[in-house]
A protein has these predicted regions:
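Ubiquitin-like/PB1-type beta-grasp interaction modules and other compact soluble beta-rich domains
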Residues: 1-78
């Protein structure tokens, strides 16, 4: 399965984009959840609050399909 993960901010540093400043192309074997993909990439699950794919809000148990573009959103912080 080939997919594209997008993010900004501190999460982008962990994502290590390679397509453009915000996007990383990822190939995974099998039917993995987003949580499992993050684990394979070494991205701490706590850095992702939620994700968007196909115009819908997705949880980390979402299973991306071939060609999906998934935008990862970090937790909101500030003061």
């Amino acid at each position: 399965v080939e997919l594209f993960l997008r993010s900004g901010g501190k999460l982008r540093d962990h994502l290590k984009p390679d397509i453009d400043p915000y996007t990383r192309r990822v190939e995974v074997d099998g039917d993995l959840t987003l949580r499992e993909i993050l684990r394979v990439l070494g991205i701490p699950e706590g850095l992702v609050a939620f994700a968007f794919a196909d115009g819908k809000l997705r949880r980390l148990d979402y299973r991306p399909g071939d060609g999906d573009v998934v935008t990862l959103q970090p937790p909101v912080s500030g003061g």
